């Protein structure tokens, strides 16, 4: 088990609305989630998530993509910003940049992402529309450790919902997002308690290799 003398620490990386960030903030405020978010970092100065962070009195940092057209320079600046806080975890919450392999390697086992599909199905973008067009019966979201291959890291937790006959991609996205707000904090709780660990490039639960993601 992890023995954090104080709350575990994290930085959260966002690009947009930050609703998953807000789910974290609400549970932290309610004393349910024992996590101290040290900073919220965005690559978009207009991200609404920055406003959410400021309202919660969390430090915000903006590293604008257009100022760093070179991916290596952007990742270096991002790494410097994260290292100022030395967090236990780095949560990607709608962070739309693909991180370079050497960046991911540096923080291996500490970076967590949430993705709007039942991975390994539908990595990448436009997951809801792709699921509908493929006549899937089920769709959902996944939390996973971030590795060098995009959306391919060890799965930790998933939640699935049925695709309804009248579902549009927008309707489906709203319903999936509600599940994201549940499983991302739940995953954080398991990480903080030490029940979930990253070892040998795999996810482990209570000392046992996690053969398949926890379904919630």
Enumerate the predicted regions with their spans:
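N-terminal Rossmann-like dinucleotide-binding module
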Residues: 1-48, 52
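N-terminal glycine-rich "phosphate-gripper" loop used for MgATP/nucleotide binding
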Residues: 42-43, 67, 71, 85-101
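Alpha-helical structural signal in soluble globular domains
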Residues: 26-31, 52, 56, 81, ...
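Short, basic/aromatic-enriched C-terminal tail that caps enzymatic domains
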Residues: 22, 200-216
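A general structural signal for well-ordered alpha-helical segments in protein cores
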Residues: 18-21, 49-50, 75, 128, ...
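Donor/substrate-binding cores of folate-linked one-carbon enzymes
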Residues: 27, 89, 93-206
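Short, well-structured alpha-helical segments in soluble
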Residues: 76-85
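Short, surface-exposed acidic-centric catalytic microdomains
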Residues: 35-76
């Amino acid at each position: 088990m992890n023995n954090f003398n104080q709350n575990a620490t994290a930085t959260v990386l966002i690009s947009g609305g930050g609703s998953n960030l807000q789910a974290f903030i609400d549970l932290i405020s309610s004393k349910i989630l024992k996590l101290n978010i040290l900073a919220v970092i965005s690559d978009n100065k207009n991200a609404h998530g920055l406003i959410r962070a400021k309202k919660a009195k969390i430090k915000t940092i903006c590293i604008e993509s257009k100022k760093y057209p070179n991916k290596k320079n952007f990742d270096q600046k991002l790494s410097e910003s994260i290292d100022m806080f030395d967090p236990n975890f780095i949560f990607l919450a709608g962070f739309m940049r693909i991180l370079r392999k050497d960046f991911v390697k540096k923080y291996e086992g500490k970076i967590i992402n949430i993705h709007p599909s039942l991975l390994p199905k539908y990595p990448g973008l436009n997951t809801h529309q792709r699921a509908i067009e493929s006549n899937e019966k089920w769709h959902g979201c996944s939390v996973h450790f971030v590795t060098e291959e995009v959306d391919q890291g060890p799965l930790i937790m998933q939640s699935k919902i049925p695709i309804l006959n009248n579902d549009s991609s927008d309707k489906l996205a709203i319903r999936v997002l509600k599940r994201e707000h549940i499983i991302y904090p739940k995953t954080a709780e398991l990480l903080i308690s030490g029940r979930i660990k990253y070892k040998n490039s795999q996810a482990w639960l209570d000392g046992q290799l996690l053969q398949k993601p926890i379904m919630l």
